[in-house]
């Protein structure tokens, strides 16, 4: 199973899970997640559950859900509202279903769930004590809400963490962007002129990977 493959290659989460099984730091918490439903996220969900939390989950992208992983998580007893190829209506229906169990914590990627809690589903906001947001785009949305005085609970900007910049943004985004280009085009990158617009941590990673494959960047 793909989850086994991911679990074997995520030693930090494995160590945290082992510790959490004894300490239960999230006992009594109800976590609503809106992240990509992939084999890696499945390992995160297992870890959060091991820490004592109840879980309800939806996908943050209509096209990123790995259906076999979603089915496996559901079979394991987790509340999963996600499938590949959702319409816009499906996407928000799944977020709404995720919120129905009245979370105390939210985990978001793009801020769609958090914005929903502050808008159409504001009846759930009072029960939330905090959340996280992973992406630059989502953080911008939430900072605008905070500046306007509209943010109803504290949110940790995961994207501001140095480990996020220097590992995920540089190496993760760099590799996955090149992987996406290769899957879409099957083009040989060596010898090509490769233009990167923007030179933050993500752009730096893309430029490094392209240069490493022989492109003129």
Task: State what each model feature region is.
Residues 28-33, 157, 194-197:
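Short hydrophobic beta-strand segments
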Residues 30-32, 45-64:
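Active-site cofactor/substrate anionic-group-binding motifs, chiefly glycine-
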Residues 1-26, 57-192:
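Glycine/serine-rich phosphate-binding loop and adjoining beta1-alpha1 elements at the start
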Residues 33-35, 108-109:
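Short His-Asn-centered micro-motif
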């Amino acid at each position: 199973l793909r989850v086994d493959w991911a679990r074997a290659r995520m030693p930090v989460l494995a160590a945290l899970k082992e510790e959490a099984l004894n300490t239960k730091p999230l006992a009594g918490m109800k976590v609503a997640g809106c992240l990509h439903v992939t084999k890696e996220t499945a390992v995160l969900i297992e870890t959060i559950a091991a820490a004592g939390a109840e879980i309800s989950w939806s996908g943050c992208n209509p096209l990123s859900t790995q259906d076999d992983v979603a089915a496996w998580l559901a079979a394991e007893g987790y509340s999963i509202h996600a499938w590949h190829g959702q319409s816009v209506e499906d996407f928000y229906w799944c977020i709404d279903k995720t919120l129905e169990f009245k979370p105390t914590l939210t985990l978001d990627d793009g801020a769609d769930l958090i914005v929903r809690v502050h808008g159409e589903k504001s009846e759930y906001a009072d029960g939330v004590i905090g959340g996280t947001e992973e992406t630059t785009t989502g953080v911008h949305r939430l900072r605008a809400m905070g500046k306007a005085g509209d943010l109803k609970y504290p949110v940790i900007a995961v994207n501001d963490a140095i480990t996020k910049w220097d590992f995920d943004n540089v190496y993760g985004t760099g590799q996955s962007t090149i992987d996406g280009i290769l899957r879409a085009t099957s083009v040989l990158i060596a010898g090509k002129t490769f233009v990167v617009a923007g030179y933050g941590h993500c752009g730096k990673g893309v430029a490094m990977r392209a240069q490493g494959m022989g492109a003129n960047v």
